[in-house]
Amino acid sequence: MGIFKKNPFGHILFLKRWLIRIAGAMTHRRYRGFNELQIVGSEILTNLPDRNVLFVSNHQTYFADVVSMFHVFNASLSGRTDSIKNIGYLWDPKLNLYYVAAGETMKAGLLPRILAYAGAITVSRTWREKGKEIDRQVNLKDTENIGIALDDGWVITFPQGTTKPWKPIRKGTAHIIKNYKPIVVPIVIDGFRRSFDKKGLRIKKRGILQSFEVKEPLVIDYENDSVEKIVEQLEYAIEQHPSFLKVIPTEEIEAEEELNKKRKWEY
């Protein structure tokens, strides 16, 4: 039974393990080679339980964001701190790691379908499909599948549901948090939009300093906090609240300019 053991979604773990190993080896230099991924807070990952953890993050590309998380999570769980040096951590990857993705995206070609086997929980967008605005009810099966994944392990979600910055948080994420009561860990990424194309499959620029920050779990009163309060908390946590668009002090601008010197494109 060992080699054919499956996860709750029917995926054979032996195949998933090899898929993560191969995909990880093929993409490693995208974050440590062609570009540099600067990681902060990865030690937080080692203190989390093995299941019922929800990671919430801002979103910059379809696939590169998630792939970086597979690298950082597995590297941290294998003993590395803020580093993905030496891809030996891919030999024994965390197999109960999932990510929420639009079904439309994961069916758009052979490669997305293969990547879906690595842990995608596909959901139907309620507001957009094939580039057009729509309005439909939430598919309760989608929510149920996220609950199944949380019961089995860790789940990554992008609560804005789009790669465009400053878009509002979808309330569905807050409802999931209230219903399943996971530990909620925010992640803030940057530099991916400059490094990759929108899909995150093609390298657009090299020599980009990418950043990846893992924050402490949020303090949430699952019973008494309103959906609106949780949404606002998520906006602040992943630094997508409108207040982050405020006028930036001069000293912060100067510090950012120094950092941008490391982000200059190399041709």
At which residue positions do the language-model features occur?
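A transmembrane-helix-recognition feature enriched in membrane-embedded lipid enzymes
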Residues: 2-40, 68, 109-118
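Helix-to-loop junction immediately C-terminal to a conserved catalytic motif
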Residues: 27-60, 70
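Amphipathic coiled-coil/heptad-repeat helices and related helical stalk/stem segments
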Residues: 38-41, 107, 139-143, 169-173
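Catalytic core of membrane glycerolipid acyltransferases/transacylases, capturing the structured
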Residues: 49-133
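Internal catalytic-core helix/loop-beta-alpha segment
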Residues: 121-166
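A cross-family acyltransferase "interaction/gating" segment
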Residues: 151-156, 161-229
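Short, well-structured alpha-helical segments that form the helix of a local strand-helix-strand
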Residues: 230-242
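Short, highly charged C-terminal tails/helix-capping segments
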Residues: 249-267
